[in-house]
Amino acid sequence: MASPNRLIVAVTGLPGSGKSVVARIVAEELGLEVKVMGDVVREETVRRGLEPTPENVERVARMLREELGRAAVAKLLAERLEPGRSYVLDGLRSVEEAEVLARAGWRVFIIGVYAPRKQRLERLMRRRRSGETLWEVLELRDASNIELGVGEALALSDYLIVNTGSLEDLEFEARRAARVAICGGDP
């Protein structure tokens, strides 16, 4: 069973939803370190002697899931977390990942961040990447994330933020979610 001082606040959402902003604000509010789930895969990509390009990282993520199961990234991350410390995780991909962390002794609180596709596309356009059209990229990334279990993690989140307003609105909701995570109920 997790002790109260072993908390993982895991943030999930589709690309462009605002999950990294929420993770940063929650970490700031609670004085916790942010661990980015994608960094685990990027590090593993380099460890395997590959350049950490988006294609290679995606390929290694799939290989890890074939080798270690759907919760592969959480299994690798759990080995790197310091026992007795609490963290904010940016990029939880599935309920299975949350279950792995809970079995390792952390109390897991999931914050889901939802934003409509049009708003996510606008946000991603500001981070513009060359190559395919952003719509194609968003379609592919959404499909990949949903296949990995993000939809289920969103549906089962302990606190859901609907990110359709201003940055100030998002900050308010993220701080509120942090308070709920700590007290385990209403803020």
Swiss-Prot record:
A Pfam match: AAA_17
Keyword Plastid attached: no
UniProt KW Nucleotide-binding keyword: yes
Top-level taxon of the source organism: Archaea
InterPro entries, sorted: NTP_hydrolase-rel, P-loop_NTPase
Entry-linked SUPFAM superfamilies: P-loop containing nucleoside triphosphate hydrolases
Keywords for the protein's UniProt record, in alphabetical order: ATP-binding, Nucleotide-binding
Residues involved in ATP binding: G13, L14, P15, G16, S17, G18, K19, S20
Family: Belongs to the UPF0200 family.
This protein's name: UPF0200 protein APE_1753.1
Stored Gene3D superfamilies: P-loop containing nucleotide triphosphate hydrolases
One Gene Ontology MF term: ATP binding
